[in-house]
Amino acid sequence: MACTGWTSPLPLCVCLLLTCGFAEAGKLLVVPMDGSHWFTMRSVVEKLILRGHEVVVVMPEVSWQLGRSLNCTVKTYSTSYTLEDLDREFKAFAHAQWKAQVRSIYSLLMGSYNDIFDLFFSNCRSLFKDKKLVEYLKESSFDAVFLDPFDNCGLIVAKYFSLPSVVFARGILCHYLEEGAQCPAPLSYVPRILLGFSDAMTFKERVRNHIMHLEEHLLCHRFFKNALEIASEILQTPVTEYDLYSHTSIWLLRTDFVLDYPKPVMPNMIFIGGINCHQGKPLPMEFEAYINASGEHGIVVFSLGSMVSEIPEKKAMAIADALGKIPQTVLWRYTGTRPSNLANNTILVKWLPQNDLLGHPMTRAFITHAGSHGVYESICNGVPMVMMPLFGDQMDNAKRMETKGAGVTLNVLEMTSEDLENALKAVINDKSYKENIMRLSSLHKDRPVEPLDLAVFWVEFVMRHKGAPHLRPAAHDLTWYQYHSLDVIGFLLAVVLTVAFITFKCCAYGYRKCLGKKGRVKKAHKSKTH
Ligand SMILES: *[C@@H]1O[C@H](CO)[C@@H](O)[C@H](O)[C@H]1NC(C)=O
Ligand SMILES: *[C@@H]1O[C@H](CO)[C@@H](O)[C@H](O)[C@H]1NC(C)=O
Ligand SMILES: *[C@@H]1O[C@H](CO)[C@@H](O)[C@H](O)[C@H]1NC(C)=O
């Protein structure tokens, strides 16, 4: 307050010092989720450690990438499965995506590969079996929990230890974000996830949107059946997903309104899309040499993400065929079997510096599975996309980018070699794609605070204030008929009907009186004339 009006640099320093001093160190519990989810959550955790907070990460001892070289206390618990089990189940899951795509809750529920989810759900049971660990957590008196809600465990931990929580997610499956945050999502223009609809839906799509919402209400709890059983067991009371999610203090959502469509939000939702974008670093020699050799045509970067390792052979050959028909050099991150028809402009690599390559001016296009990390790297660097979504939020991400003219979406199951070739030629040669993604890029980057700083601020806010109850809407305390004001509407309707009824009765009475008089007069008149 005292700083306003001062313009010399010295008071500015004082102000900065004051704001720094405000961030007193606290104690934070982190419950992460494995896989690509951890990539960005990790950057927030690292920054919180750097800022001097005492951070404890609780993770299963079997994992792909959790924990690695974090400079903080890491507590592991033993799991009921091995790394081989995890790999095998994930492979089965990824493999199934090449056969049929999940476009409804029903197909999600009926998926024959859902064992992977049950492995993740079982983590929490394992955590709470470790009595020493639970005792340690209880005695540590944390200020808050920072969690990825995917496997529910962080939500259960927050509730069990009665700690305020910060949820970190791209989105929440089913209707649990709307329910947990009490956020309205009108079905007329807010598409449900998995459908791949835009916000301008046809009548048929709006009908499908409603049915999807109904499916969520009817079927989602069955998808989370095992997770909820474990939660009820740990919390020793029957719990629903709503019970778990509605405990959340702050929602850190990895999206923004450059990627997503505008829609209603709540005051405890913070949008940190693009948190994974980094300043491009110089390229390793190997990749610089590929770019130098590509000449005036430049390069195309191709990656289906860290989670897809193998593509069915026929599909891989169709893709390789299309890649050979463009003049650009294609750098393809692929660890599966080398397609026999691979053209000489296509280079297979086991790994590539994706963000740095996308940041290079010679990069013409990005072929991606449209995972949110890749899409944001594309937005940040302004590279048009050819998108081949496979599962999760990817169909939706792709649709959003396509409707904004920043890329072309292909149905990976049905596309032919020509489709891919045409899509590539379109995004490379049609200037509008580049212009649109550059526009999105400048909109996305025009912001007062970097997403990483925003995320760190809100975690610290919850730690400082032991939650954010002032942001919690009173909607949580209402019954469903109160929320929709059905009782008020019913009451008012009753009043109006009663008034209408009484008025009608009075009029009818009055009318009858008048008529009666007239009638008698008439009658009297008649009898006189007789
Ligand atoms: C880890 O943190 C400690 C103190 O918090 C610091 O002294 C040390 O340099 C850090 N190590 C790394 C590898 O960052
Ligand atoms: C690529 O070209 C640039 C500019 O011509 C040059 O400075 C660089 O050394 C080249 N890199 C490689 C690996 O050939
Ligand atoms: C790639 O193959 C085509 C014919 O298939 C040939 O014309 C071209 O010279 C080859 N390029 C390189 C760099 O070997």
From Swiss-Prot:
UGT1A9 isoform is part of the UGT1A complex locus which displays alternative use of promoters, first exons and terminal exons. The locus is defined by 13 first exons, which are alternatively spliced to 3 other common exons and 2 alternative terminal exons 5. From the 27 possible mRNA isoforms, 9 produce functionally active polypeptides (UGT1A1, 1A3, 1A4, 1A5, 1A6, 1A7, 1A8, 1A9 and 1A10) called isoforms 1 (i1). Use of an alternative exon 5 (5b) as terminal exon is leading to 9 additional alternatively spliced products termed isoforms i2 and which lack transferase activity. InterPro entries: UDP-glycosyltransferase (IPR050271), UDP_glucos_trans (IPR002213), UDP_glycos_trans_CS (IPR035595). Pfam families: UDPGT. It catalyses: glucuronate acceptor + UDP-alpha-D-glucuronate = acceptor beta-D-glucuronoside + UDP + H(+); 2-hydroxy-17beta-estradiol + UDP-alpha-D-glucuronate = 2-hydroxy-17beta-estradiol 3-O-(beta-D-glucuronate) + UDP + H(+); 4-hydroxy-17beta-estradiol + UDP-alpha-D-glucuronate = 17beta-estradiol 4-O-(beta-D-glucuronate) + UDP + H(+); 2-hydroxyestrone + UDP-alpha-D-glucuronate = 2-hydroxyestrone 3-O-(beta-D-glucuronate) + UDP + H(+). This is UDP-glucuronosyltransferase 1A9. The modification N6-succinyllysine is found at residue 99. SUPFAM superfamilies: UDP-Glycosyltransferase/glycogen phosphorylase. Belongs to the UDP-glycosyltransferase family. It is a single-pass membrane protein. Its main location: endoplasmic reticulum. Keywords: Endoplasmic reticulum, Glycoprotein, Glycosyltransferase, Lipid metabolism, Membrane, Signal, Transferase, Transmembrane, Transmembrane helix. The chain crosses the membrane at residues 488-504. Coiled coil: none annotated. Glycans are attached at residues 71, 292, 344. Changing residue 442 to I: In a breast cancer sample; somatic mutation. It is found in: Endoplasmic reticulum membrane. One of its GO terms (biological process) is flavonoid metabolic process. Residues 1-25 form the signal peptide.
